[in-house]
């Protein structure tokens, strides 16, 4: 009997020390299994006298029940602890704010276009749109670009057929507007344009904003004043601006406009000039009565200069690490 008591006491201590369900199952097998210590004690009954067997059998059963009860209690306790730990880990604090949907930001090119539209809108310019698939008259002929001009070459222009192409500038919008509306006109035409070029500073598709003002007695001084004010407004600095003589088929005289960079070098930002009389004639406007000026700027180039971006292609790669800087 003393040995049985020691077995039970030992089992109860080990059960209390068990830290997981697997350890408890091992204890059950060690004490109550077919080869367990309690089972071995039952086998000893064969060597006892008939008078001793009932008392010994009762003692073994009591020992077995004591161990089984302790195992059950410990198993229930561990399961309860595990469940409590799981509930704590998965606890939801209903007082915490919900997950808000992250607000996106405007693409830097869109920001630039909106900035340009806002400035010229305050000067009375309206925004006009036109087709991106253009015919040769609106893209070339009406703009005084001759049949053999280099801009018409296959390596510069995406042609569908000899008469139809992806527009190479938004100037076609100006032609269409002058065909349907009479002076005075003040318009800008932002949009996508296409040229067969791709490198660090050129992409096959890019954005352009062109402006047109047609009225009586328009002169180059007005053009200079408007563009000078625009550049200072856009870059938010009192920039040095210069106008260099240049050549464009659709303007005469023509100029390119530079601003002084922070490195002390001049940076080209746009082209401009007085509308060529041939362009006015092509749309039925009398160049003896009306004059006008036009200007054109690459949106990506202005955006690169404003935000200090070195590679034009970054605007089209949709890398959120890059785009999130402009939120």
Swiss-Prot record:
Keywords: Aminoacyl-tRNA synthetase, ATP-binding, Cytoplasm, Ligase, Magnesium, Metal-binding, Nucleotide-binding, Protein biosynthesis. Mg(2+) binds at residue 252. Its EC number is 6.1.1.20. Transmembrane segments: none annotated. SUPFAM superfamilies: Class II aaRS and biotin synthetases (SSF55681), tRNA-binding arm (SSF46589). InterPro entries: aa-tRNA-synth_II, aa-tRNA-synth_II/BPL/LPL, Phe-tRNA-synth_IIc_asu, Phe-tRNA_ligase_II_N, Phe_tRNA_ligase_alpha1_bac, Phenylalanyl-tRNA_Synthase, tRNA-bd_arm. GO terms for molecular function: ATP binding; magnesium ion binding; phenylalanine-tRNA ligase activity; tRNA binding. It catalyses: tRNA(Phe) + L-phenylalanine + ATP = L-phenylalanyl-tRNA(Phe) + AMP + diphosphate + H(+). GO terms for cellular component: cytoplasm. Gene3D superfamilies: Bira Bifunctional Protein, Domain 2. GO terms for biological process: phenylalanyl-tRNA aminoacylation. Its cofactor is Mg(2+). It is found in: Cytoplasm. Binds 2 magnesium ions per tetramer. The keyword Acetylation does not apply. Belongs to the class-II aminoacyl-tRNA synthetase family. Phe-tRNA synthetase alpha subunit type 1 subfamily. Tetramer of two alpha and two beta subunits. This is Phenylalanine--tRNA ligase alpha subunit. It comes from Shewanella baltica (strain OS185). The gene is pheS.
